[in-house]
UniProtKB/Swiss-Prot annotation:
Protein name: S-adenosylmethionine synthase 2
GO molecular function, one term: metal ion binding
Function, in words: Catalyzes the formation of S-adenosylmethionine from methionine and ATP. The reaction comprises two steps that are both catalyzed by the same enzyme: formation of S-adenosylmethionine (AdoMet) and triphosphate, and subsequent hydrolysis of the triphosphate.
Catalysis performed (reactions): L-methionine + ATP + H2O = S-adenosyl-L-methionine + phosphate + diphosphate
Keywords from the UniProt entry: ATP-binding, Cobalt, Cytoplasm, Magnesium, Metal-binding, Nucleotide-binding, One-carbon metabolism, Potassium, Transferase
InterPro entries: ADOMET_SYNTHASE_CS, S-AdoMet_synt_C, S-AdoMet_synt_central, S-AdoMet_synt_N, S-AdoMet_synthetase, S-AdoMet_synthetase_sfam
Length: 396
């Protein structure tokens, strides 16, 4: 066991699918799914905002698809659980505003030449820099603090929808503080220091009932017993009342939960949101391939922890830069690992879309829009499949 002086605390948070910002992410990605299902070449930049009894969908979409935006809004809200004004929004009676224009032809010609370019020649949809991160502290190769916060939120939704905790409402937030030990650059979780859950609830339940149910039905099934001890702190609905929630409690907007979507504050973030964007937007596709690269490095045993950065210029296929850091945990020098990354991954946007099958619709992107884009066991999350890396090992 590490001495107390050698440990530190790190905190990650998450929000439920009923949080107003996450509602907007899900509507935007449901629109993207609908477009791609009918037209794999759809160019989508679809924002959503919401407030009491109102959802507005707006942005730029160029597609051959016939999209019923009002139905997508209603179906998404209903599936989350927004079915009456008292829970924050009524899916079947809220006002829906749609303001959609086509993608700028200036952007279109620079990025994909109005569909005349080969996949390997498709330029990045914008400038920017993206990061992928992986760590060996969990089976998912994700940070434990982030994994636990995310799973607590998902469990809140599960016990709400299956009736285990019928007093729950859709909105809610979680936060987990983990005590860590830095083992020569690798992160080793020691214990869970603090668990915070703030969840929307109905009028009838007491705070004591909320605390008891959250401990029994949410925390115990999610957090391994080995991480909990007599000193673990629990803050369960500490404000004392959370009846008003969803868009009634707070306005929501697509793209405001980018740290929750990624690594919970670990690694780094280039600033670009994922939801609402088709695969030509490297904010999304670049971050996905960077995660696969970082995960493949850790899964292969080349490092215990790894971050990968890539950067782009609008209209240019090749990345401007690729960077790798293993935080001192690499089995070989980082410059050799960088060579391996470059040899095994094609970072051109058109080739990323092919390698990760990113033009497929259905409900693929909707699934990413709540409970994290990374560390998920789902065949649609193709970037989570670690590649078997090929490289020429240096001669002894």
């Amino acid at each position: 066991m590490a001495a107390a002086a050698d440990t530190f605390l790190f905190t990650s948070e998450s929000v439920n699918e009923g949080h107003p910002d996450k509602l907007c992410d899900q509507i935007s990605d449901a629109v993207l799914d609908a477009c791609l299902a009918q037209d794999a070449e759809s160019k989508v930049a679809c924002e959503t905002c919401t407030k009491t009894n109102l959802v507005m969908v707006f942005g730029e979409i160029t597609t051959k698809a016939n999209v019923d935006y009002e139905k997508i809004v209603a179906d998404t809200c209903r599936e989350i659980g927004f079915v009456s004004p008292d829970v924050g929004l009524d899916a079947d009676n809220c006002k829906v505003l749609v303001y959609i224009e086509q993608q700028s032809p200036d952007i279109a010609q620079g990025v994909h030449g109005h569909l005349t370019k080969r996949p390997e020649d498709i330029g990045a949809g914008d400038q920017g820099h993206m990061f992928g991160y992986a760590t060996d502290e969990t089976p998912e190769l994700m940070p434990l603090s982030h994994v636990l916060a995310t799973k607590l939120g998902a469990r809140l939704t599960e016990v709400r929808k299956n009736g285990t905790c019928a007093w729950l409402r859709p909105d809610g937030k979680t936060q987990v503080t983990v005590e860590y030990y830095n083992e020569n650059g690798a992160m080793v979780p020691i214990r869970v220091h603090t668990v915070l859950i703030s969840t929307q609830h109905d009028e009838t339940v007491t705070n004591d009932e909320i605390a008891a149910d959250l401990k029994e039905h949410v925390i115990k099934p999610v957090i391994p017993e080995k991480y909990l001890d007599e000193n673990t702190i629990f803050h369960l609905n500490p404000s004392g009342r959370f009846v008003i929630g969803g868009p009634h409690g707070d306005a929501g907007l697509t793209g405001r939960k980018i740290i929750i979507d990624t690594y919970g504050g670990w690694g780094a973030h280039g600033g670009g949101a994922f939801s609402r964007k088709d695969p030509t937007k490297v904010d999304r596709s670049g971050a996905y391939i960077a995660r696969q690269a970082a995960k493949s490095i850790v899964a292969s045993g080349l490092a215990r922890r790894c971050i990968v950065q890539i950067s782009y210029a609008i209209g240019v296929p090749e990345p401007l830069s690729v960077f790798v850091d293993t935080y001192g945990t690499g089995k070989i020098h980082d410059r050799e690992i960088l060579k391996i990354v470059k040899e095994n991954f094609d970072f051109r946007p058109g080739m990323i879309a092919i390698a990760l099958d990113l033009k497929k619709g259905g409900n693929r992107y909707l699934k990413t829009a709540a409970y994290g884009h990374f560390g998920r066991e789902d065949p649609d999350f193709t970037w989570e499949a670690a590649k078997t890396l090929k490289w020429e090992k240096p001669q002894a």
